[in-house]
């Protein structure tokens, strides 16, 4: 969708994103009320400050500063040595003070980037990261509107990109990469369904090749990547149709109607002066020195791209497997536990090829899996020491998911131990070759593919429990002697 074909010209889509990421913190940005509000009954996680009771003053949560600085460092931002809070004035029922405390003039971080590897390592510039309060939640029922103030005052990081994105595919990768980084460093859980990672999209179009930005629309509160893509695609095409018909296009704020797949105007877009920003007189500026920044850097965990490169270089994994295993913090931790005891490629094969398939079928995450890393280690132990074959191991794996039992116990209970007694296997092989005398003759006449058939028959006879290497060796010896 980088270019939309028009009758007059080709149109380029220009997109900038504002992501509102809820800060992982025990308490709110300026009060001691709990920030764990998602499942809480309405208006139970609220302080007097959150509902703007007279005389209540804000007290800055220092941990939110730490989380914002950590985010800025992870996104290659410049951390501001001086940042300050401002009041953004507007009226809405779920904003009891009549203003939102934000950082308009002096944000906490600027000039960062997110690299889109799937789009030729394109760098999407991050203009700024600032801290601000979330608003409450309006709940509409029939003719009544209720206000839940649990969310009011929860800390948000607004991460604002430059208008560098040119397609919905780039948008999707940007959001996934950004969410992955925030999850890895533990500053936001990235759960769009719960509203802790929301996106506003600024969309405009211009004749392809032009350097001037067109009139933009802002689509508010998009809570899934799929909806972000649908909303942008619809809005871009709508703008092209308006401009192609020589109609006047005005700057608006929009909502995306999921059921109709269309955007609709909720208000004419305001400019900054409409909000009458001014410094909050109740809050001191925030001053951050190099020592503090270095301290936060020292606590920063390994980032996803660094982890992926380490998996490729240290474990000799291919890029595809390394990408998958480094894309989620819980998956990476699971993999690294298994790698402490077993070969990395064996571990990767079982996690990606076997574990993920079962997790997807059950619709659960790796953190919710009944088969923990310790259990997979025990299963791989049984394969490596030839207690069971790889084929039997897959059966055991299924039973582990169903019963939650340890692999060694399952093998013992079901008699699944690998047959590695040479005398027993000689008898089985002799029987198979005797029962298939005609095929033995065909094999001797050059039909070498039948070797696999003989192996398969032995495995069938032993219910998959025969040691594959021993079976191959014995069959080869028997055939050569005939």
Swiss-Prot record:
Keyword Ligase applies: yes
Give the intrachain disulfide bonds. none
Q: Name one GO biological process term.
A: glutaminyl-tRNAGln biosynthesis via transamidation
Enzyme class, broadest EC rank: ligase
Q: Does the keyword Disulfide bond apply?
A: no
SMART domains associated with the record? GatB_Yqey
Which keywords are on file for this protein? ATP-binding, Ligase, Nucleotide-binding, Protein biosynthesis
Q: What is its EC number?
A: 6.3.5.-
Q: Which InterPro entries match?
A: Asn/Gln-tRNA_amidoTrfase_suB/E, Asn/Gln-tRNA_Trfase_suB/E_cat, Asn/Gln_amidotransferase, Asn/Gln_tRNA_amidoTrase-B-like, GatB, GatB_C_1, GatB_Yqey_C_2, Gln-tRNA_amidoTrfase_suB_CS
What PROSITE patterns does this protein map onto?
Answer: GATB (PS01234)
What reactions does this protein catalyze? L-glutamyl-tRNA(Gln) + L-glutamine + ATP + H2O = L-glutaminyl-tRNA(Gln) + L-glutamate + ADP + phosphate + H(+); L-aspartyl-tRNA(Asn) + L-glutamine + ATP + H2O = L-asparaginyl-tRNA(Asn) + L-glutamate + ADP + phosphate + 2 H(+)
Pfam families tied to this protein: GatB_N (PF02934), GatB_Yqey (PF02637)
Q: Report a single Gene Ontology molecular function.
A: asparaginyl-tRNA synthase (glutamine-hydrolyzing) activity
Subunit: Heterotrimer of A, B and C subunits.
Q: What PANTHER family would the database entry show?
A: GLUTAMYL-TRNA GLN AMIDOTRANSFERASE SUBUNIT B MITOCHONDRIAL AND PROKARYOTIC PET112-RELATED, GLUTAMYL-TRNA(GLN) AMIDOTRANSFERASE SUBUNIT B, MITOCHONDRIAL
Q: Tell me which family the UniProt entry assigns to this protein.
A: Belongs to the GatB/GatE family. GatB subfamily.
Q: Its function?
A: Allows the formation of correctly charged Asn-tRNA(Asn) or Gln-tRNA(Gln) through the transamidation of misacylated Asp-tRNA(Asn) or Glu-tRNA(Gln) in organisms which lack either or both of asparaginyl-tRNA or glutaminyl-tRNA synthetases. The reaction takes place in the presence of glutamine and ATP through an activated phospho-Asp-tRNA(Asn) or phospho-Glu-tRNA(Gln).
The cross-references to NCBIfam families, in alphabetical order and at most eight, read: gatB, PRK05477.1-2, PRK05477.1-4, PRK05477.1-5
* Protein name per Swiss-Prot or TrEMBL: Aspartyl/glutamyl-tRNA(Asn/Gln) amidotransferase subunit B
Species whose genome carries this gene: Ehrlichia canis (strain Jake)
């Amino acid at each position: 969708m980088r270019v939309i074909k028009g009758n007059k010209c080709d149109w380029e889509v220009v997109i900038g994103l504002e992501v509102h990421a809820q800060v992982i913190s025990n308490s709110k940005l300026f009060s001691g009320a709990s920030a764990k509000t998602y499942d809480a009954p309405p208006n139970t996680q609220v302080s007097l400050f959150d509902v703007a009771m007279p005389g209540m003053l804000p007290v800055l949560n220092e941990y939110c500063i730490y989380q914002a600085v950590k985010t800025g460092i992870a996104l290659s931002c410049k951390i501001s040595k001086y940042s300050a809070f401002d009041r953004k004035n507007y009226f809405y029922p779920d904003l009891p003070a009549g203003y939102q405390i934000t950082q308009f003039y002096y944000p906490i971080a600027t000039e960062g980037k997110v690299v889109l590897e799937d789009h030729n390592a394109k760098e999407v510039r991050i203009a700024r990261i600032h801290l601000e309060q979330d608003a409450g939640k309006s709940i509409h029922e029939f003719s009544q509107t209720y206000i839940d103030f649990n969310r009011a005052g929860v800390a948000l990081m607004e991460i604002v990109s430059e208008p560098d994105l040119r397609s919905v595919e780039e948008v999707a990768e940007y959001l996934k990469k950004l969410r992955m980084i925030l999850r890895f460093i533990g500053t936001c859980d990235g759960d769009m369904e719960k509203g802790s990672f929301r996106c506003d999209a600024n969309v405009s179009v211009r004749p392809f090749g032009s350097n001037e930005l067109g009139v933009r629309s802002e689509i508010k509160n998009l809570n899934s990547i799929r909806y972000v893509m649908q909303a942008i695609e619809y809005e871009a095409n709508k703008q092209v149709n308006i401009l192609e018909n020589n109609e006047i296009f005005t700057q608006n704020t929009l909502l995306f109607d999921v059921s109709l797949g269309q955007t609709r105007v909720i208000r004419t877009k305001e400019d900054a002066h409409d909000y009458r920003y001014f410094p909050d007189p109740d809050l001191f500026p925030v001053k951050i020195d190099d020592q503090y920044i270095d301290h936060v850097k020292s606590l920063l965990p390994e980032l996803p791209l660094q982890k992926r490169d380490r998996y490729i270089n240290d474990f000799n994994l291919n890029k595809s497997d390394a990408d998958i295993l480094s894309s989620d913090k819980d998956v990476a931790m699971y993999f690294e536990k298994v790698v402490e005891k077993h070969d990395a490629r064996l571990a990767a094969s079982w996690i990606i090829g076997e574990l993920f398939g079962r997790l997807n079928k059950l619709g659960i995450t790796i953190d919710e899996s009944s088969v923990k890393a310790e259990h997979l280690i025990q299963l791989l132990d049984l394969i490596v020491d030839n207690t069971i074959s790889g084929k039997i191991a897959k059966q055991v794996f299924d039973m582990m998911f169903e019963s939650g039992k340890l692999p060694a116990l399952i093998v013992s209970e079901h008699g699944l131990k690998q047959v590695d007694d040479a005398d027993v296997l000689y008898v089985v092989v002799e029987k198979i070759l005797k029962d298939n005398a005609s095929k033995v003759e065909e094999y001797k006449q050059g039909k070498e593919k039948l070797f696999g058939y003989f192996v398969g028959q032995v495995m069938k006879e032993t219910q998959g429990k025969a040691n594959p290497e021993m079976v191959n060796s014995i069959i080869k010896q028997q055939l050569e002697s005939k």
